[in-house]
Curated annotation (Swiss-Prot):
Catalytic activities: hydrogen sulfide + 2 Fe(III)-[cytochrome c] = sulfur + 2 Fe(II)-[cytochrome c] + H(+)
GO CC annotation: periplasmic space
Name used for this protein in its record: Sulfide dehydrogenase [flavocytochrome c] flavoprotein chain
Subunit composition and interactions: Dimer of one cytochrome and one flavoprotein.
EC code: 1.8.2.3
One Pfam family from the record: Pyr_redox_2
Any one Gene Ontology molecular-function term assigned to this protein's record: sulfide dehydrogenase activity
Disulfide cross-links: none
Main subcellular location of this protein, as a coarse class: periplasm
Amino acid sequence: GTKRVVVVGGGFGGASTAKYLRKLDPSISVTLVEPKTAFVTCPFSNAV
């Protein structure tokens, strides 16, 4: 049958997981669950 994966949370970890699951196996059905409609961040903004 079809492989189905649900990823809960669309932060860095969730979005990356969903992306790479699809890249590794395009036949996987990946659903990303995230309540927010936009993702805004400034990674490493506090790095000195």
